[in-house]
UniProtKB/Swiss-Prot annotation:
UniProt note: domains: Lacks the C-terminal regulatory region which is replaced by HisZ.
Assembly: Heteromultimer composed of HisG and HisZ subunits.
Catalytic reactions on record: 1-(5-phospho-beta-D-ribosyl)-ATP + diphosphate = 5-phospho-alpha-D-ribose 1-diphosphate + ATP
Signal peptide (residue range): none
UniProt cross-references to InterPro entries, sorted A to Z: ATP_PRibTrfase_cat, ATP_PRibTrfase_CS, ATP_PRibTrfase_HisG, ATP_PRibTrfase_HisG_short
Single GO BP term: L-histidine biosynthetic process
Function of the protein: Catalyzes the condensation of ATP and 5-phosphoribose 1-diphosphate to form N'-(5'-phosphoribosyl)-ATP (PR-ATP). Has a crucial role in the pathway because the rate of histidine biosynthesis seems to be controlled primarily by regulation of HisG enzymatic activity.
Annotated source species: Marinobacter nauticus (strain ATCC 700491 / DSM 11845 / VT8)
Enzyme class: transferase
PANTHER family in the record: ATP PHOSPHORIBOSYLTRANSFERASE, ATP PHOSPHORIBOSYLTRANSFERASE ATP-PRTASE
Protein name: ATP phosphoribosyltransferase
SUPFAM superfamilies cross-referenced by the UniProt entry: Periplasmic binding protein-like II
Amino acid sequence: MTDSITIALSKGRILEETLPLLAEAGIELVDDVKKSRKLVFPTTDPNVRILIIRATDVPTYVQYGGADLGVTGKDVLMEHGGDGLYEPLDLNISRCRLMTAGKKGEQPPAGRIRVATKFVNLARRYYAAQGRQADIIKLYGAMELAPILNLADEIVDIVDTGNTLKANGLEPRELIDHISSRLVVNRASMKMKHGQINPIIEKMSAAVERRRDS
């Protein structure tokens, strides 16, 4: 399978919303991901396999050729930097917002600010672009605790409904960007396997447009 195609996905919402789009490109999983501990899955197309990995690892696997294609959130791409990746398609799924947030009714300090986030590079660029000095604190989860315990003045995190912020006495402040999942392709694979990859992109793009028009 020298010309086989490897697609990197992550478990959760992105996987669930990507599988129907892949199905319209003729690619369906043979096994049930939820019932298996495997990380590499065959599909109904004998020349295509799917990797199930951490969401934050998808750009890295695609960049360095561990996978030819991948689906990941724009937030992850912004944090990763996108080097060595071709981003041909916004899949318009897993939509949310990347925002700053802090204690309800409180204003952020005028001077140096402490910010908790898992998006360290992204947050550093964002505050620098605003001309604000920020100490970025790396956390891996439960961002809402940081302002509550005075670990940070603000957080930078993904916001969907905003209910989690509200339940913890926080409120969204500034919108950094609208986020959705993107199809990314290894640049070398796009050249060497164009004949196999381009039809996948075209069929998924058509599926996205049909959903947009429905």
